[in-house]
Amino acid sequence: MNQLPHVTVLLGEAVEALVSNPEGTYIDGTFGRGGHSALILQHLASEGRLLAIDKDLAAIATAREKFATDARFAIAHDSFASLKNLAAERGLVGRVQGILLDLGVSSPQLDEAERGFSFMQDGPLDMRMDQTRGPSAAEWVNTASEDEIAWVLREYGEERFAKRMARAIIAERQKRPFVRTGHLAEVIKAANPAWEKGKHPATRAFQAIRIQVNRELEDLEAVLAQAVDVLAPGGRLVVISFHSLEDRLVKRFIRQQEQGDPVPKGLPLREAQLNKTMRSLGKAMKASDQEVEANVRSRSAVMRVAEKL
């Protein structure tokens, strides 16, 4: 299968929203293949600094190759859920001018059969963004209970045939454990009685299993909670999400920070006592028609920006 080149989504828009001070310190929480990082560095002065983070060793190798000679750049092999610890180690808590999170899976991860993310081509059933840690998709699918599998497919994939698919997975693994993506895709496909037009019948299930294996929503909740402390006053949080589960989390978090602490109705509190920490900057942004035409994977992208008070 031909690999699509990785095209960074909402590149200019994200960096424009992020970089408010060329001499500031910034964090790219999802380095990927370095599209956002490269443009951030172009916007920074010699005093500016960029710390990039990624779970994927392939991304780490790319970062070290691309920016080896740039003294403003550093890369950490970790999850962005470790944001505050990584910032604390470098004395950056409360001093960062901007944090960028470009969520989801990069094109090389999706297109490389050996990574095990794709139902379109057969490969080892892995799906881990960080292949040095945690159980693979095969280990999870072969050991999880029927109820757990059904819950994950329903909650993370919004799959209406979750119970039916979970039952089929359990029945099949008793005959032959899952080790390949093609095997799992065929079982899910057979258990899906109503295919959505233009969408592979295993799409939602594979998304759900990937989210489960990589703890994507837990990590997102963790990094959002830490971002407020890591940012300097006036610092910005820019998040690009690719499905409704992520976007709902981000939208709810920003709204909560804008509203501050919940208080009983009628209690005489001044505005400053509500502990509001952030304000939303503008409305959610989507990729333009031109960008979607050039990069079909950008069609579901939603970008939200908030600023620390």
Swiss-Prot record:
Methyltransferase recorded as keyword: yes
Subcellular location: Cytoplasm
Pfam family, one: Methyltransf_5
Source species, domain of life: Bacteria
One GO CC term, this protein: cytoplasm
Chief localization: cytoplasm
EC number: 2.1.1.199
Membrane-spanning ranges: none
Reactions this protein catalyses: cytidine(1402) in 16S rRNA + S-adenosyl-L-methionine = N(4)-methylcytidine(1402) in 16S rRNA + S-adenosyl-L-homocysteine + H(+)
Uppermost EC category: transferase
Residues reported in the UniProt entry to bind S-adenosyl-L-methionine: G34, G35, H36, D54, F80, D102, Q109
Protein family: Belongs to the methyltransferase superfamily. RsmH family.
Name recorded for this polypeptide: Ribosomal RNA small subunit methyltransferase H
Species whose genome carries this gene: Cellvibrio japonicus (strain Ueda107) (Pseudomonas fluorescens subsp. cellulosa)
Lineage of producing organism: Bacteria, Pseudomonadati, Pseudomonadota, Gammaproteobacteria, Cellvibrionales
Underlying gene: rsmH
